[in-house]
């Protein structure tokens, strides 16, 4: 091996151009001049150096260049996408898995090109460009670029020119690092004596890398909220996990004939589901952020009643507890279960339906009500891009959508718009409706969103646990108390109107509180739980209230996927075919979620795959119908899942 240093006029010209370009870009991106000078020195050295390496060790030099490239690619992408605080959150193990994944990409390209220089150049530029795409997509809409976005790339490109993007100094640093890496690659001549041997080795190493990635990512979930995917899983791995979770396997026994056989039982409207005295009430649905009754986890004492008004509701009220499929986060899955009647029980753990599986117009309570003449309205006092609601709501069939800019942003508690402000907006929209307008409003609150550890000058904690100091729990309980006051104002208003009104209320999930507090309640915390104890962490309160006469009822346990069916029943609206199926399913399987189901036969919670007999039959039918509605566009049942008219 020999190293020679030779300065030429041509190299100096190239160096001057590169240095000036770096300085100009650095000026406009506020990059450190020390970084620019370091690049200039390294570039000057690389452009003038000549390396002669032993041909017999070509495989070693190729391996070194590929490994350096994989490490640099992963580091650069993470560095560009994450803040300094989030950058250090990624574990060493996740970093290694991402680097092995990147190495697999390099090896695949090497297999195709049989050229180390070309491979390293293509792979490093491609992976870095991939990271840049995610950066711009995040700036554009507030969540990351995923595999699902490839299906709607045309829509994104059609509006991207309307947005202004800012490039910061991190871009410059990783681009300069990539330039130096490519310069290094170009200075090293690597030739293989046998292209066939090289390709065999490349494919074998690729298989080893892929197996390593699979074995070390089987327990990982796709993360789609903001940039959690990048710092928890690494961006490259998170994207691949999104591909994995996008392909949901058809259930055993699935076929068009199987769907038709199930649907055939609900072809004619059963008289028990047909309402002759339909009131067509105004229907208001409130999904309240993190609203839960923690006493279902374990008993504890507070200085005052947390939700006195909601606890007092009984007249014209159906109330009880429902199983959510999420705990502490991933709100839109609860929203989706309510709207469609489908269940997370049959989807991959960690998936988020709004961002992974909605690409057409799913049948929902929204579309069904719209088809019978309702005006459908969605309200959420937060950003439209949150969980891609701005893209999903039109698919669901909402006529009107209201987001954070449509609310009075001075009406905040802690950092979020209050429940009361949302309810005032709902009342305002109700008062503007025409006399013959049938109205459906879905309101998703933000007031109680976690975390609960900071103190705020605009919020007084009035409720606290007696005995022990749990700052986050006390703040959370105080927020529930504020929600209860706002709820009382909402119900009081609609008690006084002449038109029939139905209000549906439920929590999306329990809050993410410190494990010590949960351990105080159930004696175990969040681990080592029985199926019953685990399901207690997924219970949320719900009620359906009307300002007209309906039976007072209590429900021990149901699940969010059934609430839209109960909503239509209490509104005296004829049930569509799928809701008739759900009504019968509810009799056999009272509650089902991502963790399991309640077995009437065994009088306990069980895993779905433990079901036997009639229960297994109904769960299988449910799975078949849900798969048909979500993934079989060609043979989607028009009876069970009609499109918007």
Question: What do these predicted regions represent?
Answer:
Residues 8, 136-146, 168, 255-256, ...:
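A diffuse structural propensity rather than consistent per-protein peaks
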